[in-house]
Each structure stands twice: as C-alpha cells, then as structure tokens.
Amino acid sequence: MVSRQEQFEQVQAVKKSINTASEEVKNQALLAMADHLVAATEEILAANALDMAAAKGKISDVMLDRLYLDADRIEAMARGIREVVALPDPIGEVLETSQLENGLVITKKRVAMGVIGIIYESRPNVTSDAAALTLKSGNAVVLRSGKDAYQTTHAIVTALKKGLETTTIHPNVIQLVEDTSRESSYAMMKAKGYLDLLIPRGGAGLINAVVENAIVPVIETGTGIVHVYVDKDADEDKALSIINNAKTSRPSVCNAMEVLLVHENKAASFLPRLEQVLVAERKEAGLEPIQFRLDSKASQFVSGQAAQAQDFDTEFLDYILAVKVVSSLEEAVAHIESHSTHHSDAIVTENAEAAAYFTDQVDSAAVYVNASTRFTDGGQFGLGCEMGISTQKLHARGPMGLKELTSYKYVVAGDGQIRE
C-alpha cells in the first residue's frame, strides 16, 4: 500500500502535466478514460459484486441502489465523461481586461486550482464524474471513497488510469487513497500544501467533520433537507406530479424532497389525494409506499406516524416524508429558514405575488416555482456532470461544474513602468 504522504507527493510531482495541458490533450485523455472504463466493465462489475455482498444487511435498500452498478450504469458513467469533452475548456478564459492610465494592461484569466481532494461515500459514479471534471478543469485529483464502495472504486480508478497511460497526461494525476479508515480522511483535511481544495460529498456527518476540522480550503456540498410548499393558490394536479417526482424518483439523492408544507386551506382536499398517489397507488403497483411523518394538523387528513421535532431536520434519503400544515406563506418561509440546509426548495402556486415572495425570501442555492427540486443537477442545468451541489456562498453555489473548479490570476503587461 502506498502511503498517503507518498500519494500527496506523487500528485504534486505530476500536477503540471494537467494544470497546463491543452484542451485537445485533455479531451483525448477523457475519451481514452471513457473507452477504458467501458472495456473494464467485467472487472468493475466483479468488484461491485464484492461490495454489494459485503454491504447487504448493513445499509438500506435505497443506499444499496446507490452502490449498485450494471453494464448500463457503467455505460452512463462513460457517457458522462464524453459529455465533459463537449464542454468548453474554462482554462485560459479571459474574464476581464483593463488598461490603466500609466499604460499597464491588466488581464484577469481563469486558471486551475491545482490539486483537488474529494472525500465521498458509497457512490461509484462520483469517481468517474470527479475524475472527468477535475481533469477538464486542469486539476489533479486525490479521491477518498467510502469503505462500502472501495472495491468498485479501485476498479474504476484502475480503468481510468489505464486510459491515461495511452496519453501524454501522467496517470498519477488521479490518485485513490487506499486507506479507508477515518484517519485517512483527517489526513486529507490537514494536507495543506498538498491539496488546494477539499470537497466532501456525503451525509451530514461527513460534511460537518470536514468543515469543522479541515485546514485546507473547503467547498461545502451540503445535505438536502429539501422542502416543497403547496400554497393556497396551488394547482393540485401540478403539486401531485411535482411531489411524486421530487420524493419517489430517487429518494437517496440530495435533491430529493424531504419535507412537505401545505397551506391549511389546501390540506383537507390535497392531502388525501397525495396519500392516494404516494401510498395506495404505489402499493397497487408493487412499489414501496411513502411513510408519512405528520404534524398534528396533517394527521387529521391522512394516516401516518406522528412527527417528532427531529423529523423536520432529517435528510431521510428514503421513502419517508415529513408533513406540516401551515397557516400562511409567511409561516412556510419561516419554517424553511429555520430548518433549511439551503440546498433546494420549491413553491407550487398560481399566484405570481406568492411566487415572488418565496423566491426573494428563501435563501437556498436553487429556488423553484412549479417544478420538481430534482432538477438541481449539473447535467440538468446544462453544466455537464457535476462535482456536487454547493450550499455555501463563497466561491461556488449550487451545482458545481467546470468553472467552479477553477480560480483566476491577474496578468499585468507593461513597457517598463515603475511605481512612483
């Protein structure tokens, strides 16, 4: 096993091969990575079978689905890499140019961060997405996968590095930390001088640990306590469709809905219809029904467990939905502000004034009017695959694509000027 220190030194030694690579060279490397990923399908699936067998009974079925790979999912991962090829190269982009009275020409241009560390949980697709985005944005990457997905991740990284071996970019620009202990995560948090940026992708425990302990700059990809508010002027059919999609299409992802707020004027008519869609119809179709966690008012209209206070602060990542009846739009917004992780929140309403109030007052990275929160995604936003959803305001916010993985510098051109 290569030590963490050796890996940090290796990636530092070769980072210039990617930091200054041309767009053509990077695109050739990405295509080679995608081809070798597909070529290694058999090996990756064998590794994934080991991870799945080890994880069964230890994590929920929803989380097992995150971990699971088949040939179609591997092909989708390769397709995601190829889509990054089609994106414009951000490196070298001129952001601003100005000329001072003394003749100095100042150009602000986009540059690579350098080396980016990614700590993430059991999601194999993050491995290929992170490698593709960091490479296209001119960065080397150090990956630290969750233990549950390590065999799969190792097989994926092996394939990606074999692809790089056929190009002029050194394979060591992609590093996988072999130690999956907690100590390896803390070592990355303290790797100042080796990592220029650290991005955690996972649950609240992981993200909080990184934010609280890292001395390396961090972009926080926050958890998603995602709200949908059904206003008194909502179209109920739209609301049913939006909630069904936001909650059930992929409950294990961070843009999935976790909390429903319903105006009291809508509760009696809307909540029984919602129960029919999310519970009865799903049972009839052989699908897992949604389990409601209901406040006292909501429990008057539908069946479910009584909500506890923590239910409105929980990212369930499962077929569970907390439901609260509110007396006004203002109460809904106040609830969101008290419990939000500032990820994605939505209002369903036909009232333009209510929509404007909601979008102005809710302080989240993505705020929706009459649409599912599942659209908070780099691919859906036209950014290609993403590094995560930033819930902070400094440097990056919302889906992080290529530009969010870069910095800038000033190039000052003169003709012998000196400062008087």
Curated annotation (Swiss-Prot):
PANTHER family: DELTA-1-PYRROLINE-5-CARBOXYLATE SYNTHASE, GLUTAMATE SEMIALDEHYDE DEHYDROGENASE. The gene is proA. Catalyzes the NADPH-dependent reduction of L-glutamate 5-phosphate into L-glutamate 5-semialdehyde and phosphate. The product spontaneously undergoes cyclization to form 1-pyrroline-5-carboxylate. GO terms for cellular component: cytoplasm. Coiled coil: none annotated. One of its GO terms (biological process) is L-proline biosynthetic process. It comes from the Bacteria. It catalyses: L-glutamate 5-semialdehyde + phosphate + NADP(+) = L-glutamyl 5-phosphate + NADPH + H(+). NCBIfam families: PRK00197.1, proA. Keywords: Amino-acid biosynthesis, Cytoplasm, NADP, Oxidoreductase, Proline biosynthesis. It holds the Pfam family Aldedh. Its EC number is 1.2.1.41. Its main location: cytoplasm. GO terms for molecular function: glutamate-5-semialdehyde dehydrogenase activity; NADP binding. Belongs to the gamma-glutamyl phosphate reductase family. It is found in: Cytoplasm. Pathway: Amino-acid biosynthesis; L-proline biosynthesis; L-glutamate 5-semialdehyde from L-glutamate: step 2/2. This is Gamma-glutamyl phosphate reductase.
